[in-house]
Amino acid sequence: MKKSSFIILSTLFSASVMAQSWPTQTAESKAGTRWWWLGSAVDKENLKWNLHEYAKHGIGAVEITPLYGVQGNEKNNIPYLSDKWMEMLRYTEEQAERNGIELDMSTGTGWPFGGPWVSLKESACRAVFVEKAISGNTLIDITPAEKDAKNAFLHKVMLYAADGTATDVTQQAKSNQLVLQEAQRGAYKVIAIFIKYGVMKVKRAAPGGEGLVIDHFDRRAVANYLKHIEQAFERTKTPYPHTFFNDSYEVADATWTPSLLEEFEKRRGYKLEEHLPELIAYEPKVLSDYRETLGDLLLENFTNQWTAWAHSHGAITRNQAHGSPANLIDCYAAVDIPEIEGFGLSNFGIKGLREDPGKTRKNDSDFSMLKYAPSAAHICGKKFTSSETFTWLTEHFRTSLSQLKPDIDLMFCAGVNHMFFHGTCYSPKEDEWPGWKFYASIDMSPTNTIWRDAPFFMDYVTRCQSFLQWGEPDNDFLVYLPVRDMWKKNINKLLMQFSIHAMGQLAPEFIQSILAIEKAGYDCDYISDKLLAKVSVKGQQLITEAGTHYKAIIIPSGTTITPELKRVLERLSPYVIYGEDTQKMAHFAQPEEMKTSCGLKLIRRRNANGYHYFIANLTANDVEEDVKLAVPFKDAKWFNPLNGEITDADIDDDGIEVNLRSGESMILQVFNTPLKESENACCSNEDKQDEIEIDNSWTLSFIEETPHIDKTYQLDKLQTWESLDEKTRTVMGTGVYTTSFELKKKQLDANWYIDLGDVRESARVYINGQFIGCAWAVPFILDTKGTLKAGRNELRVEVTNLPANRISELDRQGVKWRKMEEINVVDINYQKTLYDQWKPVKSGLASKVRLIYK
């Protein structure tokens, strides 16, 4: 192989090779965060301070979501959409602009959309079926059961004869009593439909936002809801936000809407009311048609209307479609920024990554789930795919920066390029620690100890997203989403919600298809019937209406081919693959050996100069292999998103050397033409050296700590501090480890890295007074960057721990810090609990520190 130097390119590049530099950073390439306003009890001084802190630490967008308040703080609560609330919003907009932060807001408080201005008849509703045998009676009582009777209104009464005929007898029902005519006594069954309104109230609502959830399927209900919000903006002359947000669809009891029967007949070509026995019995065809109709209404009356409304006011929409009883691809495609969600912590077995048994929950968003929103974005030419990121990774106060990286890397590989933390609570600067908290948050805020080194994580995200937002998607295949096969499934209820937590049950066959395609070395995007109808063949490829190219479309095994789908596929022939046929896949596209040989996760994008990859080693193995790429190239560069370094790649023909330790990630850019040689480039002739263990005595002191510790500790060997004494057992903050070591002149010929081993939880490192970087993710290894010298070298390592030991001490002392209203603070299983029994969490340097040759 051609050996190229691994040196940062510090010279300015000419215009012809500017692609070798990092893409321009924007507010969108920075991390965003969901910003909870508890009780909307905000004030201008603290808004200004909070936004400045966020900007200083690298946050580029905030999304205001008002929630319930703080106990004893009721006098400071500000009712949602009141003149005072709108004044605070205007001030926030001004301060956000000054700090270079984009301002988004939820289109309501808590979730889902709703409030006190939603009338009963425009609220979410469900069908109550009253089924009675006739048995020769002429008077039938069709009164709903007591539990269903409140707010239930008679909608339709149908009579069913033994020969299958159905008769509408609604007009014969009075006061829940059905009077049959003599000729009708031969029928065997009557089914009455009542519509029960008000089946859900806004969850976690803020003051002024309490009330009924809207009927998402009803156009007028949605329009009236949005009109009320619009009036507040117009009344107060407040500028609209950059983006309106909608959280995942969680109206589990909404199975009906007043126009459903009419809309069903219009769309499906027959009357649903004539087939209620089949619907109640979950007969596949009727059930599927019912579910498809609800999906159509949600898309048209809610998603499309909401987006059009936002556009009419100069704003855009960001939407979580998951949970919807609709084709997710169509719902994601209907908005400006589709958003997926992570829920829990993935376990990849990465070497050296902290584990916390019993204090984490499994990630329900596997790789196949994460690809729904990016698929819609790619197919429709949308620049951004966002994510609700790090929801419920661990118990409160126990989430480290190192635990964040694998899951954000997985999201990046799925196609996410505009992440939002879940999230950040507005908290007054002077509020006693731990301040205001939201129960399902990693707490990316100034009140968390990880905030000190969070800018280094933010830099990582920004560098990754700047590349992932650049260029165009380059996935190999489209994959048909067989949603009608899913709709036919009997899950013992009418409504089928495609939620993160349910996909394993609803779509196991589809998930296996996606994993098989991934294992074969390819990448794909999911497509719906609606979007597939607009795909054409051009230049021996499939091209979407937005201009995105694919090699072929894969029809997953077991998919029902309807006549309509058959006609579309015939038009796209021969670029159709039935089943997970890897030989046919290889006929259309080259697999990526980084996937098949190394087990790496990656995503590839096209740009004007070639291609670029984001690559993550989410395995327990270190990878050092020569691999062939699936795309042609003449030259290549590695971009390290952890530290910003740009280095030459070792290449040979269409192959490249890949070196990634367990947990590491890199960006690879390959070019269509050879690059000019850098004046700084030279081949390395360094001799490999043995590692050097820094095993001298250490000193340990503390900065920015609570409670304050004056003492300096003398350590014969490295150890974490929670076991030193009672004070260190409960301290949160930064411990400063210092030592010195000797090097001989000949040892300086090596390119040394410092390996900190097991860090709890992040560490800033200084050698001879020079800052060399922050180690916040595994492996905790940093380049010494020429700071070493012959003779005595001074080493300073500033380690910041988690606040877990401090909060457990507050619980032992009986401090009332759980002061939020409503759900307050619960554990990962949504149970109220104390942390007083927590064992001390390791804090500091937990293993040997070495100099290694890399």
Predicted feature residues:
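Mature N-terminal segment immediately following signal peptide/propeptide cleavage
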Residues: 20-61
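Extended acidic/polar, glycine-enriched regions
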Residues: 149-152, 156-234, 652-690, 790-792
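Short, surface-exposed tryptophan/glycine-enriched loops
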Residues: 782-792, 803, 852
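Acidic/aromatic-lined carbohydrate-recognition and catalytic surfaces
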Residues: 67-175, 180-184, 190-203, 209-214
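Bacterial Sec-dependent N-terminal signal peptides
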Residues: 1-21
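Short acidic/polar inter-strand loop motif in beta-rich domains
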Residues: 675-676, 800-809
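Carbohydrate-binding surfaces of carbohydrate-active enzymes
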Residues: 31-32, 43, 47-48, 61, ...
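Aromatic-lined ligand-binding clefts that engage carbohydrates, nucleic acids, or primary amines
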Residues: 741-768, 775, 795-799
